[in-house]
Amino acid sequence: MKIWVDADACPNAIKEILYRAARRVKIHLTLVANQYINPPASDYIDAVQVPAGFDGADNHIVEHLQAGDLVITADIPLAAAVIEKLGHALNPRGELYTQNNMRERLSMRNFMEEMREGGLVTGGPPALNQRDRQLFANQLDRFLAKHHQPPA
């Protein structure tokens, strides 16, 4: 199992939680972005820079992930593609995407997109707060305890 991070929009506080988790449980973590990322030195952490362009990081992740891998993303279409490939997706606010909730999330995303295009809604979600970071860390710990077998 491996953790992939859609790193272009991933908050730094979430990346720090992921770095600590990767070293603690000895799981491979790959950050994928269309800009240079300098992760901390570790045998378990690396970064891939993809060419700039629409969905470059998303496409790289979907192309390389294996069934059972975890992807950290707030991008709902990417999460849907991950689940379709039998991976797992967790957003930076600690919500685990599943086959059961994905249709609802896609519908809500499309609705909000239409509202933004019509000028009825502006802006995005509120900034990540301490509670969000704690929810993410707790969900990540639960997920890793259930799905990851550290090397001996």
UniProtKB/Swiss-Prot annotation:
**By its UniProt entry, which InterPro entries does this protein fall under?**
UPF0178
Which NCBIfam families does the record cross-reference, listed alphabetically? PRK00124.1
What does the sequence similarity comment in the record state about its family?
Answer: Belongs to the UPF0178 family.
Q: What is this protein called?
A: UPF0178 protein AM1_1179
Protein source organism: Acaryochloris marina (strain MBIC 11017)
